[in-house]
Amino acid sequence: MARVKRGVTSHAKHKKVLKAAKGYYGRRKNTIRIAKQAVEKGLQYAYRDRKNKKRTFRALWIQRLNAAVREHGLTYSRFINALAQSGIEVDRKALSELAIHEPAAFAAVVEKAKSALPKAA
């Protein structure tokens, strides 16, 4: 049986790692062992932050909505409650975009939601 030499496969693996480490600083970009660790850590950060991105954007939409709704004399929590009571099912992302790009339409949504709130409050 012929002897199997692993030069081709290991070279391909090393090339793959170094390609992924392109743009890194210092020995992280050209030393296999260090580059491998750096790439692995980078992939861990990427995985973690893909999850965190969803939380971050939701928080951003809520901040924007809170600011926009306060201009109309409501707080964010009362606005969301009013939306639920009036049966308006629009997500926070869409409401945030509406508040930024279509202020008149957003004002109409706020007024519709306000009408669902009890007058005593």
Swiss-Prot record:
<dbReference type="Pfam" id="PF00453">
    <property type="entry name" value="Ribosomal_L20"/>
</dbReference>
<keyword id="KW-0699">rRNA-binding</keyword>
<dbReference type="GO" id="GO:0005840">
    <property type="term" value="C:ribosome"/>
</dbReference>
<comment type="similarity">
    <text>Belongs to the bacterial ribosomal protein bL20 family.</text>
</comment>
<dbReference type="GO" id="GO:0000027">
    <property type="term" value="P:ribosomal large subunit assembly"/>
</dbReference>
<dbReference type="InterPro" id="IPR035566">
    <property type="entry name" value="Ribosomal_protein_bL20_C"/>
</dbReference>
<dbReference type="GO" id="GO:0019843">
    <property type="term" value="F:rRNA binding"/>
</dbReference>
<keyword id="KW-0694">RNA-binding</keyword>
<dbReference type="GO" id="GO:1990904">
    <property type="term" value="C:ribonucleoprotein complex"/>
</dbReference>
<comment type="function">
    <text>Binds directly to 23S ribosomal RNA and is necessary for the in vitro assembly process of the 50S ribosomal subunit. It is not involved in the protein synthesizing functions of that subunit.</text>
</comment>
<keyword id="KW-0687">Ribonucleoprotein</keyword>
<protein>
    <recommendedName>
        <fullName>Large ribosomal subunit protein bL20</fullName>
    </recommendedName>
</protein>
<dbReference type="InterPro" id="IPR005813">
    <property type="entry name" value="Ribosomal_bL20"/>
</dbReference>
<dbReference type="GO" id="GO:0006412">
    <property type="term" value="P:translation"/>
</dbReference>
<dbReference type="InterPro" id="IPR049946">
    <property type="entry name" value="RIBOSOMAL_L20_CS"/>
</dbReference>
<dbReference type="GO" id="GO:0003735">
    <property type="term" value="F:structural constituent of ribosome"/>
</dbReference>
<keyword id="KW-0689">Ribosomal protein</keyword>
